[in-house]
């Protein structure tokens, strides 16, 4: 949580303004240098605050905590620089390196040295430092730093973009944390375990969507000033809606067929909540697509306040209903809060960009969702197999403009590799 204040979300501004100036080297240098000054000043000030607090109240592992904050801040900065420059291969490789090195360090410290909780901080700090060093080497980061390139107007411009993203990030954190705190307080840790189990499945969907969303935020920022941007954004929003509604419903049906293997009989009560949370996470992903458009438009204020409103709604609904409907309050409040964010963001985007969801597809999607809903709660394997087959045929047909070119592209790539 402290990381949001340490960085002021300036790394997101680096991505947005570097991608906008890919062909303007001097502007890139000025933005990166100016942003690095903001980061170093904030990280330095945060270090002094930590030292001051530690002198009054001892902070456990204070050196590791400070190192981890610096490491994460620096890594986030250069990783967003890589995205802004279009170095997506390096971005993916670095993400892999950070994940693997964190895992290896944790295993060595926990298994080999029995270090316990401290291993998490060590792994966090050093894995991010490794990723940072990789980016510095691959991107030649020093070429983007020039002492005389600091520009106060560019700093102001970037902060206007990044500061509204702080309440946005904090609100997401509060929304995710408040559910669990409210559940523990009113219902107990056993129910929190059930809710945690129910949330495991939506993370599968989130992992798939994140890959798409990373590419989307880049492409929409590149296209935002094009003459045909409305046509492009509308097309991509509709394609994203079609593809991920299909993926989401596919996961729902697969869960109904394999719940006891995936989650286990001891968490049987999680079954009903998974459906609600999967629908909620789909709406959340559509919020992210709209957030990408707003980011491209540099309207981060809307991103910030819509998330704050959603987080408040989530907490209020949860508090109001948890004593009457129990754990369902958490899953329903999550769904409703995401829907609120989606509605507000859609209205904001439609004021600037033409977006129209296909009415015909929406009717078909709702009809298919009702069928999936019936099969999910009826819980007969043979029926859900039939539904899965029907859903697959329907989904492939609806997404043929995406899937068939993708398949042909993969075939051509494989053919080229064979010839080489």
PLM regions and their residue ranges:
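Alpha-helical transmembrane segments of multi-pass membrane transport and lipid-handling proteins
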Residues: 4-6, 33-59, 63-64, 234-284, ...
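Helix-loop junctions and terminal segments of transmembrane helices
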Residues: 6-23, 202-241, 291-296
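Membrane-interface junctions at transmembrane-helix termini in multi-pass inner-membrane proteins
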Residues: 17-22, 71-95, 278-309, 349-353
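Small-residue hotspots at the loop-to-helix junctions and early N-terminal turns
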Residues: 62, 189-200, 270-275, 331
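Interhelical loop/hinge segments that connect adjacent transmembrane helices in multipass membrane
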Residues: 63, 117-121, 133-176, 219-231, ...
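Hydrophobic alpha-helical transmembrane segments
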Residues: 93-141, 309-313, 327-348, 388-391
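Transmembrane helical elements of multi-pass membrane transporters/channels
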Residues: 98, 120-139, 152-221, 280, ...
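Membrane-proximal transmembrane or re-entrant/amphipathic helices at the cytosolic face
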Residues: 375-420
């Amino acid at each position: 949580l402290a990381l949001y204040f340490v960085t002021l979300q300036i790394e997101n501004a680096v991505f947005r303004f570097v991608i906008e100036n890919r062909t303007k080297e001097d502007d890139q240098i000025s933005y990166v240098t100016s942003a690095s000054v903001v980061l170093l000043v904030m990280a330095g000030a945060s270090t002094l605050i930590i030292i001051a607090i530690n002198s009054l109240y001892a902070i456990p592992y204070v050196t590791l905590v400070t190192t981890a904050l610096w490491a994460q801040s620096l890594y986030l900065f250069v990783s967003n620089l890589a995205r802004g420059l279009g170095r997506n291969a390096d971005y993916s490789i670095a993400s892999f390196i950070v994940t693997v090195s964190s895992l290896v360090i944790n295993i060595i410290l926990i298994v080999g040295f029995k270090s316990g909780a401290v291993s998490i901080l060590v792994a966090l700090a050093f894995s991010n430092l490794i990723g940072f060093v990789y980016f510095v080497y691959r991107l030649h980061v020093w070429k983007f730093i020039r002492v005389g390139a600091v520009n106060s107007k560019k700093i102001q411009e970037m902060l206007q973009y990044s500061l509204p993203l702080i309440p946005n990030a904090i609100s997401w954190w509060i929304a995710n944390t408040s559910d669990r705190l409210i559940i523990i307080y009113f219902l107990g840790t056993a129910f929190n375990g059930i809710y945690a189990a129910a949330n495991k499945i939506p993370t599968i969907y989130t992992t798939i969507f994140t890959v798409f969303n990373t590419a989307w935020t880049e492409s929409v920022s590149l296209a935002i000033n094009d003459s045909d941007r409305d046509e492009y954004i509308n097309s991509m929003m509709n394609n994203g809606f079609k593809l991920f509604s299909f993926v989401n419903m596919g996961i729902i049906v697969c869960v109904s067929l394999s719940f006891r293997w995936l989650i286990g009989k001891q968490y049987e009560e999680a079954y009903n909540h998974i459906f609600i949370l999967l629908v909620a996470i789909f709406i959340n992903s559509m919020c992210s697509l709209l957030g990408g458009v707003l980011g491209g438009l540099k309207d981060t204020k809307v991103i910030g306040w819509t998330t704050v409103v959603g987080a408040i709604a989530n907490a209020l609904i949860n508090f109001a209903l948890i004593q009457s409907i129990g754990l369902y309050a958490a899953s329903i409040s999550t769904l409703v809060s995401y829907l609120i964010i989606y509605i507000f963001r859609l209205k904001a985007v439609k004021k600037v960009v033409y977006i129209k969801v296909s009415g015909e597809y929406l009717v078909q999607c709702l009809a298919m969702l009702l069928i999936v809903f019936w099969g999910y709660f009826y819980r007969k394997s043979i029926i859900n197999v039939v539904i899965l087959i029907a859903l697959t045929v329907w989904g492939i047909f609806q997404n043929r403009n995406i899937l068939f070119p993708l398949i042909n592209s993969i075939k051509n790539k494989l053919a080229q590799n064979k010839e080489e």
